[in-house]
Amino acid sequence: MVMGAFTGVLFNLTFEKSLGSATPWLSLVAAGLVGVVFSLIHAVATITFRADHVVSGTVLNLLAPALAIFLVKAIYNKGQTDNIQRSFGKFNFPVLSDIPVLGDIFFKHTSLVGYLAIAFSFLAWFVMFKTKFGLRLRSVGEHPQAADTLGINVYLMRYCGVMISGLLGGIGGAIYAQSISVNFAVTTIVGPGFIALAAMIFGKWSPIGAMLASLFFGASQSLAVIGNQLPLLSSVPTVYLQIAPYVLTIVVLAAFFGKAVAPKADGINYIKSK
């Protein structure tokens, strides 16, 4: 997400004059590709060289912000980029925006990427549970030995899984940076990735479940923005509203971690000879 956010903002600032309103959308492609390249580091370390997944992930979490800020200072000679002038904008849904009450809340002056993300979760569910590729991908995370016996290339499928996660993480970071912070700095991506992990666990490793959990965490994050405008929360200090998403993350993990069953081979290196 960090590298995707940096790439998305950099692409936006570089090509906004030549690409116009398509700039933020095309920046998602660039951010996704950078996410894939960065995820390959993790894939090579854990799949090919069988490094510990936690150690490799920790190294990348330390490397990404440091590399991004180094590049920001090298390009802009300061600690953050300039603010972008072109974002995804707001969208009104025809017909739906005319519905009393609900139309004003959900379908008028809203973010289109949010609805695209919801639609994508259903597409991801279909691919994972209803297609041959998805079943193979799940099998190498559940029981790689059995998958190998059936002729499935475990290493290739695991590489595909990591690269897809890098693609989506890069796109997610670019959307976050261009929708909320409108620039990139060291504090642009602080915590959303870990909240995404919590959403995955809360959603029991299902795309639709993770989407619903993300909506829950997103609603808690929005309290920091609009909480003071709500009568029930107007007297609550802003700092408490800002930490609410992370407190809820800890509570959810403590309550549901034992109930959410992860794939049996999650985080376990596969050795073909065993």
What positions do the PLM features span?
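Hydrophobic core segments of alpha-helical transmembrane domains in multi-pass membrane transport
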Residues: A5-F11, P65-I69, G114-V127, V162-G172, ...
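Short, non-helical or kinked segments that cap or interrupt transmembrane helices
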Residues: M1-T7, I47-L60, R136, I180-F194, ...
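Alpha-helical transmembrane segments within multi-pass membrane transporters and channels
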Residues: S18-P65, Q221
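Transmembrane alpha-helical segments in multi-pass inner-membrane proteins
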Residues: G169, S179-Y246
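Helix-loop-helix "hairpin" substructures at the membrane interface of multi-pass membrane proteins
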Residues: F106-F184, P207-I208, L212
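Cytosolic-side transmembrane-helix boundaries in multi-pass membrane proteins
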Residues: E142-T149, N153-L156, G227-K274
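Hydrophobic alpha-helical transmembrane segments
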Residues: V2, W25-L33, V55-T58, Y115-A119, ...
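Transmembrane helix-bundle core of multi-pass membrane transporters
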Residues: A64-F129, P231-L241, G267-K274
